[in-house]
Structures are given as C-alpha cells and as structure tokens.
Amino acid sequence: MNFISTLIIALILRILYLVYRKRNPSFYTVSLVIISLIVWSVKSYLLDYYIIPTSSMAPTLKAGDLIFAKPVDAQKEQLMRGDIVIFRAPAFPSFIYVKRIIGLAGDTVTYTDDKSVQINGRMIGQLNLHNDHTSTYQALQERNAQQYEYVIDNRKPFVKPIYTQWVIPDGYVFVLGDNRDHSWDSRFFENAVGTPRHLRGLVKKELLISRYLATAFTLEFMKSDFDIGENSLKVISE
C-alpha cells in the first residue's frame, strides 16, 4: 500500500473514531458527508480503486486484488510500453478491463503460432522458467525499468487471433493480459460496428480510464478466480 492510500484510510478511520466517541446523530450526518466527499474527490482526481475478479493479469494481478490507479487524460498522459491500464471495452463500454500496453502508435505487433509476441521485429521478454504446464517470461517496463512476468500455458493449443500482425496508428494502443492463454485482449477483441478492419482489436486512447499504480491488498474470499466468461472479464469498480 502506498503513502497516499495509507493517509486516506487513516483519515477516514480517524473520522469514524470521532463519530463513535461523539455518538451524536448530527455529527454522524456531517461525518458521512465528509467521508463521501473524500472518497469522491480521491476517485475523481487522485486515485481510482478496483477489485480484480479474474486471473487474466496473473501473476502481476491476481483475482481478489484491490488495486489503486491514477485517472488518465488520454490526450496528455504519456503512455509507455508495459503500463497496466484500466479501460472500457471497445465494443462494450459498460465492461471495464485491465490489461498491459504492449504496442503504441507507430509499432508493428506480430503474434506468432508459437504464442510469442514481437514488437517491431523484437520478441518481448526472455524465457525464465519452463515446465510441462507453463512457460514464464520476464520483460521490462519502460516507465520504471522494472521487470514483470507473463505466462504461457503450454497445455493450451494456439488459438488463431483476428490477425497475426497489427500496425498501431495514432490514438490507439495494443494490449495483452499477462496470463496470455487466459486473457481476452487485443488479439481477440471485437470493436464497435463500423470500425475499419485494420483497427480491429486495438483500443482507442479515449477509452482509457486510469493507469495502475499499486496493489493495496488481496480479498481472501475472492482469491479463487471466479471467471465470468472470457467475453466479459469485468473489473468491478463501483
């Protein structure tokens, strides 16, 4: 949990403690209004919060993780490869997804039948661990030069995507889940009716809501992935 989130929680707990000590109905009302304003302000301008319901971003984000994210202005935010973003699904805006940015404007993304992903001809990541079940790769985030892992399920057959190569135009990003064989992402996304064929699977920057910052804690009762369907991997935000 980062400093800001700790400070906010401490402030709310302090208010609740004062409410308990006062035990005055009018003080209850004022305190609830203050807490509501704090939560609204934080969510609107400083931090977003979400609960992850599936394992599509494992091992980075697990089912049951409560995460904090920074609201983004798609026109001003400098996005980088490796950023984890929360966004509205291209064809179903009521669904909210969380994925990792792999390709930016000007990139050529290639997905091969051995499940590897290349950016401008260079493979993403290096093999770290391999067994009969999974292969784990390590790759680098551009923003902080830290490593992250993504996983390929060796038991799953190759599923042909809508395309095997995308050229990313201005205003769009290409996203993938870290749990590659258990993620519905730019390889398979449907887009709104009328979207040109070469844009299928890509996510408009204007659909981006926020950028992942940190994981606060894991809700134990949600640790087992209750997958609600590969077509509706929804992040609960309200």
Placement of each model-derived feature along the sequence:
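Internal/C-terminal transmembrane anchor helices
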Residues: P25-L46
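Soluble "head" domains of membrane/secretory-pathway proteins
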Residues: N2-R23, P59-E238
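Short hydrophobic alpha-helical membrane-anchoring segments
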Residues: L11-L18, W40-D48
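N-terminal signal-anchor transmembrane helix
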Residues: L46-T60
